[in-house]
A protein has these predicted regions:
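Membrane-proximal helix-turn-helix segments that form the acceptor-binding/catalytic region
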Residues: 11, 39, 63-82
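Donor nucleotide-sugar binding/catalytic pocket of nucleotide-sugar-dependent glycosyltransferases
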Residues: 77-117
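Conserved donor-binding/catalytic core segment of Leloir-type glycosyltransferases
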Residues: 119-138, 144-148, 159
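Nucleotide-activated donor-binding/catalytic signature segment of Leloir-type glycosyltransferases, i.e.
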Residues: 168-188
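Short alpha-helical donor nucleotide-sugar binding micro-motif in glycosyltransferases
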Residues: 184-185, 192-197
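Aromatic "clamp/platform" in nucleotide-sugar-dependent glycosyltransferases that forms part
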Residues: 205
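Short hydrophobic beta-strand element within catalytic cores of glycosyltransferases
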Residues: 222-226, 236
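Conserved acidic donor-binding segment of nucleotide-sugar-dependent glycosyltransferases
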Residues: 237-249, 256-263
Length: 300
């Protein structure tokens, strides 16, 4: 599809609908839709769906440009914020001037059912599982260092699924019988890794959401995540499905705690599975979407 065909398609969608949902707010589909709405006599509600947490740039120029751009967009009464989470994700919209009544939770989702298992059985070897890209901000090297310092003489293994720019460096430096790099895995092979894991670890320095947390909990696998992981507020904090660490030293403490406490591990496992089967699922997403549509209809 050429750029002109894409533009024609966006204009067609704009004309045919009273409410338009766009993923993100800094791409040409959203910007074009926003501009069309400014000049249209027949105003539409334009929802931007975002998994981005509030993060204010330290660079003053970037901070100013971001404030100008997002303030113009988010203060517009026809723009809605569809927030992937209910804490810092909503703060993003609030910070740049969007009124609370125009902000809706639109929960970040995966197909949970692919990962369900009836009875979680803990393996003889305690498997810590990481799934994700091997890039700097995922903090995998620090995870490996913490694991090696705490579990060198214990019956535990760190299994790393994924690839990325740091893969060769990390493999060459850390691969061993206890730290295994498994490369990319998909579909049934990936599900199998989740289902046999004892505990999932997400040590990111920055993570807008982290759908791997959804996948792990759906498989009944407790999660240890850093506080920077966007999913931690809705899926871990106060849910007894895992632990949220303020730093990597605390992260390591939680790894040891769950290793030494199989009863707690199984409680977290059941709670995580229950949360994903009975609450944070496609039905919940549908209810949130219908609620937003119902409210918008009253404004039209």
């Amino acid at each position: 599809m050429s750029i002109f065909d894409k533009i024609r398609f966006i204009i067609k969608i704009f004309k045919e609908n009273n409410m338009i949902i766009v993923n993100g707010y800094n791409n040409y589909p959203f910007i074009l839709t926003f501009i069309l709405n400014i000049f249209s006599c027949n105003k539409k509600f334009v929802a931007t769906e975002s998994d981005t947490q509030l993060q204010i740039p330290t660079n003053p120029i970037k901070r100013f440009v971001k404030w100008i751009y997002l303030s113009i967009i988010f203060r517009n009464k026809y723009v809605l914020g569809f927030s992937g989470g209910s804490d810092s994700h909503k703060d993003l919209f609030r910070h740049y001037g969007m009124q609370g009544e125009r902000i809706f939770l639109m929960p970040m989702m995966v197909d949970n059912s692919k990962f369900y298992q009836k009875n979680k059985v803990l393996p003889e070897v305690f498997y810590f599982l990481y799934v994700g890209r091997l890039v700097k901000h995922k903090n995998v090297e620090e995870l490996i260092k913490v694991f090696k310092s705490r579990f060198s003489n214990l019956n535990a293994e760190l299994r790393i699924v994924g690839s990325g720019e740091e893969e060769e460096y990390l493999r060459n430096k850390y691969q061993s019988e206890k730290v295994k790099f498994l490369g990319k895995k998909f579909t049934a092979d990936l599900v199998e890794e989740f289902q046999k894991a004892s505990c999932f670890v997400c040590p990111s320095i920055y993570e807008p959401w982290g759908l791997v947390v959804n996948e792990a909990l759906s498989a009944g696998v407790p999660v240890i995540a850093t506080k920077e992981v966007g999913a931690s507020y809705d899926l871990i904090n106060g849910k007894e499905t895992g632990c949220v660490a303020a730093n990597m030293a605390e992260f390591g403490d939680y790894m040891v705690e769950l290793f030494n406490n199989p009863k707690k591990l199984l409680v977290f496992s059941k709670n995580g599975s229950d949360l994903m089967q009975n609450k944070w699922n496609y039905d919940f997403y549908t209810n949130c979407l219908n609620k937003s549509i119902k409210k918008v209809k009253k404004w039209q």
